[in-house]
C-alpha cells in the first residue's frame, strides 16, 4: 500500500526565532495596539482635560454667545436663513481652528446640488455640526430633533434660521415641518439629515429612522451618504473633554430615488446604511 507523505515544516532554530522576535519588537510603530494606551494617556491625559475645560470650551461658548446674538438680531432682516448660514459657518470656522483638529474630505466631493439632494450623515459628536458647516461648501438646512430648541442660542438659531424641526415623540406635530422640508428640497435647498435620529452613545452606527428616506423619495432627491470618521473620539456624549486629533469626512456616491415610492423606504434605508458602513470601514487616510 502506498503511503501519502506529509511534509512537516522546517523548524527555525531557537536563536533565529529569538532574533526575529527582537527585530519585530524594535520595528513596532508608536501607534501600534500595544503602544496605543500609553500614547493616548500622554495625548489625552490631564493636560488635555484642563485645556478643554479652561480654554477650548470657554472659547467656544464665547463664539456662540457673540455670533449667536448678532445672528439672531439680523434674523429679523433675513427670513430665509441665508445670512444665518453665513454666521453659522463663521462660528464653525472659529471652532475648528480652536480645537486644532485637521479635517480631510475624501470621496465624491463634486457636491452636485443641481437637483434635490439629501445628505445622510453619521452623528457621533456635538462637533459634527461645525465640521459640516466648514467642509460642505454650500448652503444647506439641517433636520434636527425638537429637544435642541431648549438649548440657549443654539436652539434659538435653529428656530430662526430656516432649519427643519422634527418632534420624534409626536410625529403628527411634525407634519408642517415635513411639508416645509419637501418645499425646501424641491426649491433646490439641500437637506442634511442624521438618519440615526441623534448622536450615537457608543461610537457604533445606530439603527436608521425612516424619515430621511421618506423625504428623499417624496422629493425624488438623490441621497449622498457621509461618514464622519473619529468624531466620537474627538468629543463623545456627556463630556466637555475635546481630544484634539485628525478627522476625516468621507463622501459616498449619490444614491438615486428616481421612480421609487414610499414602499421602498426600507430598501433605500438599507442601501444607504450599507454605503455608510463601507465608508466607515475604509482605511484611514494618512495624509491629513
For each predicted feature, which ranges?
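Non-catalytic C-terminal accessory region of glycerolipid acyltransferases
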Residues: 2-43, 47-50, 175-288
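Conserved H-X4-D acyltransferase segment
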Residues: 35, 39-40, 52-59, 88-144
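A transmembrane-helix-recognition feature enriched in membrane-embedded lipid enzymes
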Residues: 39-104, 156-160
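Short, basic, glycine/proline-bearing loop/turn elements
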Residues: 92, 163-167, 197-198
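A generic structural signal for alpha->beta connector loops
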Residues: 100-102, 139, 160, 188, ...
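Membrane-embedded segments
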Residues: 124-180
Amino acid at each position: 500500500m502506498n503511503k501519502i507523505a506529509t511534509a512537516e515544516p522546517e523548524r527555525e532554530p531557537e536563536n533565529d526565532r529569538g532574533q526575529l522576535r527582537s527585530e519585530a519588537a524594535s520595528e513596532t510603530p508608536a501607534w501600534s495596539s500595544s503602544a496605543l494606551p500609553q500614547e493616548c494617556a500622554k495625548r489625552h491625559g490631564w493636560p488635555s482635560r484642563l485645556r478643554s475645560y479652561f480654554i477650548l470650551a470657554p472659547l467656544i461658548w464665547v463664539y456662540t454667545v457673540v455670533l449667536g446674538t448678532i445672528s439672531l438680531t439680523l434674523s429679523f432682516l433675513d427670513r430665509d436663513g441665508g445670512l444665518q448660514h453665513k454666521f453659522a459657518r463663521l462660528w464653525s470656522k472659529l471652532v475648528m481652528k480652536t480645537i486644532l483638529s485637521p479635517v480631510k474630505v475624501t470621496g465624491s466631493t463634486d457636491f452636485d446640488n443641481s437637483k434635490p439632494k439629501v445628505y445622510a450623515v453619521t452623528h457621533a459628536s456635538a462637533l459634527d455640526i461645525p465640521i459640516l458647516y466648514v467642509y460642505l461648501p454650500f448652503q444647506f438646512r439641517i433636520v434636527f430633533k425638537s429637544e435642541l430648541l431648549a438649548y440657549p442660542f443654539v436652539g434659538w438659531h435653529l428656530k430662526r434660521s430656516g432649519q427643519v424641526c422634527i418632534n420624534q415623540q409626536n410625529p403628527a406635530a411634525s407634519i408642517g415641518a415635513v411639508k416645509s422640508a419637501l418645499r425646501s428640497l424641491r426649491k433646490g435647498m439641500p437637506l442634511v439629515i442624521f438618519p440615526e435620529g441623534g448622536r450615537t452613545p457608543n461610537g457604533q452606527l445606530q439603527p436608521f429612522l425612516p424619515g430621511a428616506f421618506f423625504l428623499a423619495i417624496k422629493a425624488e432627491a438623490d441621497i449622498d451618504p457621509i461618514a464622519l470618521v473619529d468624531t466620537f473620539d474627538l468629543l463623545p456624549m456627556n463630556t466637555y473633554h475635546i481630544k484634539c486629533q485628525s478627522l476625516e469626512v468621507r463622501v459616498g456616491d449619490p444614491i438615486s430615488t428616481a421612480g421609487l415610492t414610499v414602499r421602498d423606504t426600507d430598501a433605500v434605508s438599507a442601501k444607504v446604511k450599507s454605503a455608510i458602513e463601507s465608508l466607515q470601514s475604509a482605511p484611514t487616510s494618512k495624509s491629513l
